Amino acid sequence: MKKGVLLNSSISSVIARLGHTDKITIADAGLPIPSSVERIDLALTQGIPDFMSVLQTITHEMQVEAVMLAIEIKNINPLLFSEITRYLHLLEQQQKKPIEIIYVTHEEFKTQLPDNKAVIRTGECSPYANIVLFSGVTF
């Protein structure tokens, strides 16, 4: 049995194949996922699993160079926005490398989804609970 934090074999496989600047998205339950992108559906019911648990687990395995958020999250979901930015600051310290935060409109966010290696759907049901993770390098 795998000893690491991340046990999901599909997500582990995607992370293992990522190259520098490749992207994966962690999505809320409502984000439209293009059929051309690998969809890893973790959603069991509303709120399970929640967005932050999935983000924290994935970033235990993945080096993150940058993230993309919909600008709307700042005003429409400020509690989650604050939790995400606090966590990213902690992750920067753990990785000993900065993480750039890129803001786009929600419509722009959706247009870049076909370029992702995978979209991981959570059970999160709060607005704009979506993040693109850009793969970094560990050296």
Curated annotation (Swiss-Prot):
Identify the coding gene: rbsD
Note the Pfam families from the entry: RbsD_FucU (PF05025)
Which organism is this entry from? Proteus mirabilis (strain HI4320)
Q: Which reaction does it catalyse?
A: beta-D-ribopyranose = beta-D-ribofuranose
Molecular-function GO term, any one: monosaccharide binding
Question: Where is this protein localized, as stated in its record?
Answer: Cytoplasm
The residues responsible for catalysis, as annotated, are 20
Top EC group = isomerase
One example of a Gene Ontology biological process annotation: D-ribose catabolic process
Q: Which domain of life is it from?
A: Bacteria
Cellular component (GO) terms are: cytosol
Residues annotated as coiled-coil are: none
E.C. numbers: 5.4.99.62
Q: Which family does it belong to?
A: Belongs to the RbsD / FucU family. RbsD subfamily.
Q: What is this protein called?
A: D-ribose pyranase
